[in-house]
């Protein structure tokens, strides 16, 4: 029998996060599923859940992996059963669903968003997959609208720029771009060239080299039409705009982009996305991150999760390099600070929930 109270990291009235031992375990109804958390990962978005983004008492955290404990009466479409090892990304610090977040002993998710962890991956590796592959799928195949996907690859390869190729979203994007039949052109520091190439990049460039954008345009014969910016700063946007070919194209960021940079090239169409949009529900965070409910986004979320299941089952995608730490939720608090202070580079930070 599932306990009624649990430990979780929750928002405070002061706009921070603390460890609580008296939080309610989510009720399971409809097509939702209860999961006992075995591992969680910390993402840059977790560092942004402060101040006005905090709902007092709401559970924090996005990426998790664990074991199915309970299945709702309407959760019958995705072959999810008690005892299954699963992972995904959910929306933590959600004012509309405050009892659900990854940083808790038990969490809940609708059945269709869950990925079964294949036998060759650990809970810790599973916990690193959600945000990286969900967000990049949304960016590449919805926002940028690449004319091909991992199930039906493009027949004519074309170069796709992935800025920040050594980040967790970057290595996920490189894999997906290649599986979709395109040529991933990535940027990163020289020390990470081999890492990014090992994930499938066709060519890798040093973003700090002053000739980098001209070298990319020369290498790609000025044909880049699509750019995914996994770093999403003003300088990274400027870089992508300079690397996109003469005919223009599309640019997608993971944070709000600079309108000033956008005005420098009218032939480039900019956009920015957030992973939780794939749930199709209202995102009631402050502007500019508020979003209305969007059924079309929800439909894409169902589609893309099904694609990821197939890719995982076939062993076609692999997680970013991870650093595994013990200590459970108390240590996750320190992990959030490690990410905020940029003490972790080139690896995804994962915490075991049970020692």
From Swiss-Prot:
Protein name in the entry: Trans-enoyl reductase
Molecular function GO terms recorded: nucleotide binding; oxidoreductase activity, acting on NAD(P)H
Top-level taxon: Eukaryota
Reported induction: Expression is positively regulated by the trichosetin cluster-specific transcription activator TF22.
InterPro entries referenced in this protein's UniProt entry, alphabetically: ADH-like_C, ADH-like_N, GroES-like_sf, NAD(P)-bd_dom_sf, PKS_ER, Trans-enoyl_RdTase-like
Residues binding substrate: 131-138, 275-279
Function comment: Hybrid PKS-NRPS synthetase; part of the gene cluster that mediates the biosynthesis of trichosetin, a trans-fused decalin-containing tetramic acid with antimicrobial activity. The PKS module of PKS-NRPS1 together with the enoylreductase (ER) catalyze the formation of the polyketide unit which is then conjugated to L-serine by the condensation domain of the PKS-NRPS1 NRPS module. Activity of the Dieckmann cyclase domain (RED) results in release of the Dieckmann product intermediate.
Matching SUPFAM superfamilies: GroES-like (SSF50129), NAD(P)-binding Rossmann-fold domains (SSF51735)
Biological pathway: Mycotoxin biosynthesis
Species annotation: Gibberella fujikuroi (strain CBS 195.34 / IMI 58289 / NRRL A-6831) (Bakanae and foot rot disease fungus)
This enzyme's EC code(s): 1.-.-.-
